[in-house]
């Protein structure tokens, strides 16, 4: 599993990875985990996505860029986000729907690491 360094709200994290899960109706959910600067303990950093009622493609998610202001540009730099096809309204906020490169996402995913050792 590849890891990355991430900075959010003036806090630096290292050895970060995505936990890829699913919301109730099968839509992808992403959470970021990693270590705060010099700490070796892994902790939850942020939920990156928001569950919505709108129909999304299998490789689309809604990014919570209100809580994670630099996340989309960061995901673009990693090659995980391919495009931003539209926006949706969630609790009075206009949030972007992004198209993901799932192969690239899974390179940084805890789930992929578990599957590798399970086979």
Go through each PLM region and give its residues:
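Short, surface-exposed beta-edge/turn micro-motifs
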Residues: 13-15, 25-30, 78
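A structural detector for beta-sheet-dominated domains
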Residues: 7, 19-21, 31-33, 51-53, ...
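Short, charged/polar N-terminal "headpieces" of proteins
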Residues: 1-23
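Hydrophobic transmembrane signal anchors and adjacent membrane-proximal interface regions, especially
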Residues: 4-6, 11, 54, 61, ...
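Short intrinsically disordered terminal tails
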Residues: 1, 115-119
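Acidic, aromatic-enriched beta-alpha/helix-loop junctions
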Residues: 31-80
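Short, flexible beta-strand-to-coil junctions
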Residues: 22-41, 85-89
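Short, compact, well-ordered microdomains
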Residues: 64-116
């Amino acid at each position: 599993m590849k890891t990355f360094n991430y900075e959010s709200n003036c806090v630096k994290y290292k050895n970060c990875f995505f936990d890829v899960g699913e919301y109730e109706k099968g839509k992808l959910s992403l959470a970021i985990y990693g270590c705060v600067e010099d700490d070796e303990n892994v902790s939850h950093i942020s939920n990156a996505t928001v569950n919505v009622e709108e129909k999304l493609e299998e490789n689309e998610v809604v990014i919570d860029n209100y809580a994670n202001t630099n996340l989309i540009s960061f995901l673009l730099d990693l090659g995980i986000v391919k495009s931003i096809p539209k926006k949706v309204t969630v609790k009075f906020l206009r949030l972007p729907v992004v198209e993901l490169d799932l192969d690239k996402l899974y390179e940084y995913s805890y789930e992929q690491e578990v599957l590798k050792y399970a086979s």
